[in-house]
Amino acid sequence: MPAKVLDGKKIAADYRANLAQEVEQLKAQGVTPNLTVILVGNDGASQSYVNNKKKSAEKIGMSSSIIHLDESTTEAALLEEIDKLNNDDNVHGILVQVPLPKQIDETKVLEKIAPEKDVDGFNPINIGRLYAGVETYIPCTPLGIMEILKHADIDLEGKDVAVIGRSHIVGQPVAKLLTDANATVTLLHSRSKDMDAVLKRSDVIVSAVGKPGLVTKDVVKQGAVIVDVGNTVVDGKLTGDVVYDEVSEVAGAITPVPGGVGPLTITMVLNNTLLAAKRAQQ
């Protein structure tokens, strides 16, 4: 029996419908949640991502602005722009689109965004709060993965979960969230030994490496849930880490690429922006 397809577009659409209702309730109280995105330079993919975020926010009733700065913008000028947004009570969520030009230190930029407006969850203070188990903003892709897993008909408690990739954006935070859900988590990376053995016993595999063909049918146990966060362009086509067609034959449930995790990532940006607007009223 082929795997259940975990349709990120459908899950995201349902989630956004609920967000839209909450946005309307907040607007009735005189507060319109605002997401402001800063784009430095003219990278085509980045422009597309930024426009998508703006449209998605406006579609559920939020306001959204794009601040487009020149490629030659200095680090000091960008930090000054962020400072203005930090002090603007009408702005609830601030995103700075990466990658940034080489003259700008990304770490300094993330540190500059006020933690209470850091809807990406990348400010070191918010990362620390996540691991301390206190109120914070959870990075959007890990949050989206957890939402997808709710639709996979699996109780994570006590399950063996393999997370491939240890980035601060996906791998490490999703491992923390899965641990909080009482799963037994193994975090795998390029130096891991016996990766195949770990994958073969895993009830859930989350792959977030960006290496097409990494997860094949022979390392997936029958009925396992597969979440593919890979996002690599091969011959003009978006491709995940998982060999989808063959793994679908043995998996119990699987996310496609595209149309799996991606739609949930932007949805969780909206979720965190709404949360920031609510917290600002408290």
Curated annotation (Swiss-Prot):
Gene3D superfamilies per the UniProt record, alphabetical: Leucine Dehydrogenase, chain A, domain 1, NAD(P)-binding Rossmann-like Domain
Reactions catalysed according to its record: (6R)-5,10-methylene-5,6,7,8-tetrahydrofolate + NADP(+) = (6R)-5,10-methenyltetrahydrofolate + NADPH; (6R)-5,10-methenyltetrahydrofolate + H2O = (6R)-10-formyltetrahydrofolate + H(+)
Signal peptide: none
Residue positions binding NADP(+): 165-167, 190
GO terms classed as biological process: L-histidine biosynthetic process; methionine biosynthetic process; purine nucleotide biosynthetic process; tetrahydrofolate interconversion
Annotated EC: 1.5.1.5, 3.5.4.9
Any Gene Ontology CC annotation: cytosol
InterPro entries in the record: Aminoacid_DH-like_N_sf, NAD(P)-bd_dom_sf, THF_DH/CycHdrlase, THF_DH/CycHdrlase_cat_dom, THF_DH/CycHdrlase_NAD-bd_dom
Disulfide partners: none
Keywords in alphabetical order: Amino-acid biosynthesis, Histidine biosynthesis, Hydrolase, Methionine biosynthesis, Multifunctional enzyme, NADP, One-carbon metabolism, Oxidoreductase, Purine biosynthesis
Top-level taxon of origin: Bacteria
GO molecular function: methenyltetrahydrofolate cyclohydrolase activity; methylenetetrahydrofolate dehydrogenase (NADP+) activity
Pathway: One-carbon metabolism; tetrahydrofolate interconversion
Subunit structure and binding partners: Homodimer.
Similarity-based family: Belongs to the tetrahydrofolate dehydrogenase/cyclohydrolase family.
Function: Catalyzes the oxidation of 5,10-methylenetetrahydrofolate to 5,10-methenyltetrahydrofolate and then the hydrolysis of 5,10-methenyltetrahydrofolate to 10-formyltetrahydrofolate.
Name of the molecule in the record: Bifunctional protein FolD
Origin species: Macrococcus caseolyticus (strain JCSC5402)
Chain's gene name: folD
